[in-house]
Amino acid sequence: MSRVVWCARSERGSGSVLAVAIIGATVSIAVALCLVLAAHAANTRAQVAADAAALAAADTASGRIPGDACGRAAAIAAEHGVTLNGCDAGRTETFVTVSLDFGWITLTASSRAGLPDSVP
């Protein structure tokens, strides 16, 4: 009988250790999820900026807006807080690549825009 009492006494306080472990795991998962969601938001931001820059460059290349197509794409990219890495502006189609620094990684996004008949 004393043996059963001794085992029960040796586990006293283990519930609080288990609770701390569960809370720690939950906080770790929440922090990791926040980082993943922030990276996804930054990637979406880069893609939106690439799309806007490509559309602006396509409008400029088609002659609807006066000026340099890649210069216009760089200006739009800068307004969105990203860096223009590449711009290939033709009369009917424009390709744009932008990058965004997110902590220790660099996110890149590409976009293509052009006249309705030229882009499938």
Label each region the model flagged:
Residues 2-3, 104-120:
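Low-complexity, S/T/G/P-rich flexible repeat/linker segments used as non-globular hinges
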Residues 2-70:
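Alpha-helical assembly-interface signal, strongest on the long, hydrophobic N-terminal helix that forms
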Residues 55-102, 115:
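Short amphipathic secondary-structure patches
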Residues 31-34, 96-112:
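Short, structured secondary-structure boundary patches
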